[in-house]
UniProtKB/Swiss-Prot annotation:
Span list, region Regulatory domain: 401-524
Record-linked SMART domains: LeuA_dimer
Keywords associated with the record: Amino-acid biosynthesis, Branched-chain amino acid biosynthesis, Cytoplasm, Leucine biosynthesis, Manganese, Metal-binding, Transferase
Name of the protein in question: 2-isopropylmalate synthase
Top EC class of this enzyme: transferase
Organism name: Caulobacter vibrioides (strain NA1000 / CB15N)
Subunit structure: Homodimer.
Listed NCBIfam families: leuA_bact, PRK00915.1-3, PRK00915.1-4
Known pathway: Amino-acid biosynthesis; L-leucine biosynthesis; L-leucine from 3-methyl-2-oxobutanoate: step 1/4
Signal peptide stretch: none
Top-level taxon in the UniProt lineage: Bacteria
Enzyme Commission numbers on file: 2.3.3.13
GO MF annotation terms: 2-isopropylmalate synthase activity; acetyl-CoA C-acetyltransferase activity; manganese ion binding
Amino acid sequence: MTSVPAGAISKRDNVVVFDTTMRDGEQSPGASMSLEEKLELAKILEEMGVDVIEAGFPIASNGDFEAVRQIAELITESTVCGLARAAAGDIDRCAEAVRRAKRGRIHTFISTSPVHMKYKLQMEPDAVLEAITRSVSHARNLVGDVEWSAEDATRTERDFLKRCVEAAIKAGATTINLPDTVGYSYPSEYGELFRDVITSVPGADKAIFSAHCHNDLGLAVANSIAAIEGGARQVEVAINGIGERAGNAALEEIVMALRVRGDHLPYGTSVDPVHITRASRYVSAITGFPVQFNKAIVGKNAFAHESGIHQDGMLKNAETYEIMKPEDVGQGATNLVMGKHSGRHAFREKLKALGYELGQNALNDAFGRFKELADKKKHVFDDDIVALVDDALARGSEKIRVSRLRVVAGTDGQSAELTLDIDGVASTAEATGDGPVDAVFNAIHKIVPHSAALRLFQVHAVTEGTDAQAQVSVRLEEDGRIATGAAADTDTLTASAKAYVNALNNLFARKEKSRPEAAIASGF
């Protein structure tokens, strides 16, 4: 079965795609992103055609406020949204953050389930209703686009939920979100919830209804699709499905489910899926969260066929075992071989096919790094090129660079001699360790003393073969600050050194820019 052409679905039938990778996605333990990484991700999301970018929770910290503010100034096509509790201070801070957005939105929420009202809010239902009216009205006086969410909607008493929705719409909410906050619902009951609320609440036709599903039972995507069947016209999603606990509904899965199965649900999205793989890999690189090999749409094996019977069918007609083309999501039709004899024009066209449009300086830099890699490898595959470019994108401020590394390993121990370039000045140190990687990291510590603790060290081969590139992710933590670094190289130890140094660069940049923060976590 082939995908429905993007132009076959009219704009009025589109489902609004609301991306919360930088807000709910960042609430995944260890998934903290720097300001520079968020700005780059925002550009990727806008280029993809994402309708709404939830850029952060402005009252939570100065860092979140600044991210929302700068993204609001940067983005011109997508709506930029900030999150706020049902409190005037939250809403005012959010309004200030999105003030310069061409299209700005305030997303305010309050819990509505009995367990949340009793134990979390310690509020009576009537007080919650008053808070909804007060907060939504206040937000609507500041911006024209206000979303209201009933936190823990799927465990809320139905009649009370309808009263809350009616109050929010009367107060001026333009979008109503009914989140499955704890991933509790089944698709049939979640779809029925939307049908019931939309058909029975007065004024429901004045608002767009939205689904926000968590994946605690592995049903986030199925529930989101069921909500669309029930009348929802916005879905709240995250790249790679990252988010609190088991994560959110995955953007890539919902977008492609709607595109491939247009015969079942005649609704499209504004997202150009050719950018999906690039976005997935970038988010994986900056968070250090690997994408499982069998992950739908973006996993390494999503378009792999090993069975002889399957391969035979694919050679005769790809539709025998593929319901979409890998090119549709930016994975490239085949692993075309690129090598040291490939020219700049071929390299540029390959980047375009993989979803990258680089400026001339960035292209020249990437091409030079590609030629260096091609001299080390017999064949350079699509995944090698993606890792090479994403490695450059993932790097933050580069005050420190790896200049030279020599490792000696033997039965009597391992030692590393490392030279780092720090603001143009070379510094060299030797160190031993419990293994070659430990020796390399100890050498870095000798040159750049720090108190950061290593929280993650992860290595995987980008492609197959003994000359495959190693992609390394490192996560450091110091005084509550978390920084991630990623690097790729044909030599695992060199990649490890570069990843550690990239993490240090990001950590030091974050320390320089940090101000006192009040960490406030949102529930859904």
